[in-house]
């Protein structure tokens, strides 16, 4: 968990900097800064909430920045560079394990499965997981949710990631696709739309879904510092209201309309690719239907973290999960 040392260093550097948690824009809307871990169709409901005006209906103007990695996203949140982070719940556990007077609270779940796919360099007429034995596997960052879920799934199929694979984990998150495209690895774990783009370009072939294999977990969740939630409970509520409306929209709307709604966030991606990716995620129910983070999912998350050797102690559900905003959004 070397990334935590990076966070602590950055926070120390920024202790002299005071940033406003939120402010009013010229159009009278309250500004909320969101740091997302990556830009992905996996997060479609967030972008729907922006383009369909659901945040604006709640009196909010949401500014989204992409941090490109869980460590960078959490650094941004802790150092007050963002009010809300969209990132894996494991990051809140890591911060809690290090000791903090201002824990990171998960208040609204966005996705409920892993969002990565196994991409093979060579096409397979039929795929079985044991074909990965003795292969070169380009994985994700140690301690990150993609890598931990990947290892969990491999173990479920009788593969020891450390002993049965040549596992590469020293490549920065944002550079993993380029590394695979340049010839590194026989298999790679990728998010969409990169996996589908590689398949379309003949660089690789999607052979399995880690999300379909791993079960339901709080994979990406909106979270904020406890202090921000205490001081801005109404803002958090209105933000959650908009997210829930977007979640309902995604489940009730034809894929083509969803794709058109989020296309402004993916200007370099063809509409047919966006449609294909949304369908892929919808089929495996990756989009959470409500913002409520369930306790059983929280426990499975920690089982996965524990198997990866990154969990120091079980963190109780009520310690880092707050469901009152999601419940009110649903029941209002």
Give each language-model segment a name.
Residues 1-8:
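Bacterial N-terminal signal peptides that target proteins for export
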Residues 18-21:
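C-terminal motif of bacterial Sec signal peptides marking the signal peptidase cleavage site
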Residues 23-25:
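Bacterial signal peptide processing site
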Residues 28-162, 167-170, 179, 186-192, ...:
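Short, glycine-/small- and polar/acidic-enriched structural segments
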Residues 67-71, 86, 140, 144-145, ...:
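Soluble non-cytosolic domains of exported or imported proteins
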Residues 91, 173-266:
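Pocket-lining segment of extracytoplasmic ligand-binding domains
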Residues 230-312:
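Secondary-structure end/capping motifs
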Residues 301-332:
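Conserved C-terminal helix/tail region of periplasmic/extracytoplasmic solute-binding proteins
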